[in-house]
Amino acid sequence: MTGLWRGQLRSAGARGYNGRRNAFGRGVHALDLKRINDHVSVSGQIQPEDVATLKSLGFTAIINNRPDGEAPDQPDGAAIEAAARAAGLAYHAIPLGRDGVNPELVARTKTALEGSAGPVFCFCRSGTRSTTLWALSQAGEQPAEAIIAQAAEAGYDMSHLAGYLGRS
């Protein structure tokens, strides 16, 4: 699945920021939540100051699927974790990097989702890695078509994972 994942990253084209640049070359931040279902939403990169908004929207946990140091304008996960903890939100660092998807990442995602007291917010650079880990964590829990449809409704094509998602 690693090769599949790398190809997907190259072709994704989505950005965690809205694409505009300011005078300092940093992305102009826009929080763009995409609802997968009543329990999970995803987006691209967030900033520590977004945590208060996430809390006000009713999220109880944050899953960070982006490795630190992936881009120069990316905040450290520790800063987002500190903001989450200060706001009373659970925080899970489950980075999906160049080594690709593996069973441990999927299991950790499933555990974090199942252990949450309420809605969970997941992020990476574009939301694609977060959606991929969510989809794979649902294998065997929901029909493959339902998983793929929920992701598609949020704007993510997970049809390439159908063989990994199990029952139809």
Identify the residue ranges that each predicted region occupies.
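Substrate/cofactor-recognition hotspot
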Residues: 127
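Short cysteine clusters
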Residues: 124
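Cys-dependent protein tyrosine phosphatase-like superfamily
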Residues: 5, 16-120, 132-168
